[in-house]
Amino acid sequence: MPDLWSESILEGRKLSIYHLKSTLEKCPFLFGQSKKSKDFQFGSHLFLVEEQNVFIFGMECIVYEKNKEFIVFVSKADSTGFGSKGVSCNSLAFCCLVTLIDGLRKQGAENVTLTLFAIAQGQYLFPESVDNGQKHVLNDSGLLRWWVNCLEKLRKYYTDSEAPNDSEKQKNSTLLPKAYLFVPGLENIRSYLPNRHWIESNAITTGKAVEELPRFPDDPKCRYLCELQDEKSDMSVEEFWDTLTYRQECSSGKLVGFFTLQLQFYQTREFIAKDNFGDSGVMIPAKLYRVTYDTLLKHPFGSLSDAQSSTEKFLSNTLSAVQNLKDFHYKRYKLDICGLAKRDDRKNHNHSKPATQANILQPRKKVKK
């Protein structure tokens, strides 16, 4: 797995990857009062990427699990604007997600559903970073294309580019991934989608909304579903998606997107035993994780000096809090990476090898009507 990161970063660049994950907690209402909620647990993962003593990228994911079924909700992804030109935030996001998903595969995952809600904002994880002048803030259209690019690399990464030659390769390959995008109020979504493997819809389209749709933090679906639950509504999933267009963030005048990527895996002993960065991350108590996460949100990143100071203080305090925990391994807490990608490799990159691609999507201005 370190190779994945190295091949995504321009030669000569050096990064440090930090990965914290919380212990599992019960999650009795992921699907409201539906029986589907039974036995689900959840844990959080925080990835932070440091370059030259300052954080340049971060991502938080919440993983819900039951048996061999996993739902990965990308809660937040953000940059500070202080990364060098040889480091693509899109590729960093891709590497974080592969690291997380491969870790779930080592746990025996057979079904992994990756989902996220994309809404354009100036900052998500790094306070005041929108003010530093170096941060490239995408508009709503640009953000949708940015996530399409990232998830398309994931889709290709988990799809065999050539037909398996033997039964063992067949067992170790994924079933065909399915990618979905729904943009409330936008009829022509096809212009955002790269190929026929993407579906202009939601992954869940049938049944009763309050029983079939999961509820995630800071997700407009959750607030609406809770209202329907209180009203004891029998609204269908199809009607839910139609009416969501006129509610809350979805009716603000900006484009927002609901993304889903469905992955299915065959398991083999070879993959489960494989020693890779899927083992990354320091497991910490859920309460300590929340305290650590909240601390990050209190540090300023409005200037380079502030960002460097905030990075140093956060890492120092975090290490002091976790290094005495049972089973702490520093190499799982921090991974140092040296970039290996050549400029020509990145420029002429073939999508069949998504690990080496690093593209930053530029925002496109909406046509004024």
UniProtKB/Swiss-Prot annotation:
Modified residues (N6-acetyllysine): K221
Annotated InterPro entries: HAT_RTT109-like, Histone_AcTrfase_Rtt109/CBP, Rtt109
Residues covered by the Rtt109-type HAT domain: 1-346
Signal peptide: none
Keywords assigned: Acetylation, DNA damage, Nucleus, Transcription, Transcription regulation, Transferase
GO MF term list: histone H3K56 acetyltransferase activity
GO BP annotations listed: DNA damage response; regulation of DNA-templated transcription
Any single Gene Ontology cellular-component annotation: nucleus
Binding-site positions, acetyl-CoA: F117, H136, V137, L138, W146
Function: Histone chaperone-dependent acetylase that modifies 'Lys-56' of histone H3 (H3K56ac), which occurs predominantly in newly synthesized H3 molecule during G1, S-phase and G2/M of cell cycle. Histone H3 'Lys-56' acetylation is required for S-phase-linked DNA damage tolerance and proper silencing in pericentromeric heterochromatin.
Family per record: Belongs to the RTT109 family.
Name of this protein: Histone acetyltransferase rtt109
Organism of origin: Schizosaccharomyces pombe (strain 972 / ATCC 24843)
